[in-house]
Amino acid sequence: MAALGHLAGEAAAAPGPGTPCASRGARLPGPVSSARNPSTVCLCPEQPTCSNADSRAHPLGDEGGTASKKQKNKKKTRNRASVANGGEKASEKLAPEEVPLSAEAQAQQLAQELAWCVEQLELGLKRQKPTPKQKEQAIGAIRTLRSKRTPLPRKRQLMHSLFGDYRAQMEAEWREALRALRAAAYSAQVQPVDGATRKKSQRVCRPRSIWRAKATLDMPDEEFRFNFF
């Protein structure tokens, strides 16, 4: 009986599959409840409350995320700025630099412009019927443009007042003359003719025997001599 009671006591002390262990049940209920519900407060006086720890942990994570995002955005903006600067530099390198004209080229261009303006004034006097006042003004303008004492700004001002944008007019006239020359050169070239056109325009000229007989009859056998008497 004592053995049976001892065995029964051991069986009662041994944990079953559905009953929790005694060592597990020795834990305090406070931390477990706080772990399950983070809004509850721990009973330990030395440790901070769970709600405070959670509230401290989350802002740090948010601040770190925002800081990393800001750094990434800064890097992206720097890369875009460097790419844009590189593209601008490349476009500047590819753009052709305008070479200023030399003194000789400028003098030659000015002489051509003056000659064109003088020629236009002379043609206007010849082809049109100007009034005496217009004729006097045109002659005065020709003298001013041909004079070496007249300063260059005065000549340019006079040409601009008479013809407006004279450089554009000169360029248009030059293009028209070049087009006419090209058309004349193209028309002067000998172009090969196709076989069909040759067959259509082909003609055969054969002399007739009647004309030969008449020519032989009209020619005398005697030698021709001048008869002055």
Swiss-Prot record:
The modification Phosphoserine is found at residue 82. Signal peptide: none annotated. Residues 1-96 are annotated as: Disordered. Keywords: Acetylation, Methylation, Phosphoprotein. InterPro entries: DUF4615. The modification Omega-N-methylarginine is found at residue 27. Residues 1-16 have a biased composition (Low complexity). Residues 69-79 have a biased composition (Basic residues). The modification N-acetylalanine is found at residue 2. Pfam families: DUF4615 (PF15393). Belongs to the UPF0488 family. This is UPF0488 protein C8orf33. It comes from Homo sapiens (Human). The lineage of its organism: Eukaryota, Metazoa, Chordata, Craniata, Vertebrata. The gene is C8orf33.
